[in-house]
């Protein structure tokens, strides 16, 4: 589906921003051992579209700025684009996965020090003089929004099976 979507988006110059969250693993396999690519955004060249990699996608401000640039490019009618965000999956891939034992402990420790939420809190305090109380208010508000969204999803009706294929284009 990825290649077909990118090919059609490029062919029709669709305003599509494809974001690849590269956490370096395909379930438990290190992607760097599975491909000769250093960056997945280089796949964009095969579709004749631009691809950009954010090497430190744990910096929230950098991700925001690069996403805004990419969105502006796409919205301006230039066609699709790939934006790769290199980050780290701190937990396992799925509940039935055996944790993160397959990861290099030194690399895991290095990335855990770069937790995006902690880095953003530090940046807000150091560069913007945001106080601990304000950070706590933000965290509490986000937690409340998540709880409300979860509660809504728990009681929301399931979609009807007969509409599952609505708006799906299949050119077979």
What is each PLM-predicted segment?
Residues 1-155:
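Glycine-rich ThDP/TPP pyrophosphate-binding loop and its adjacent helix/strand module
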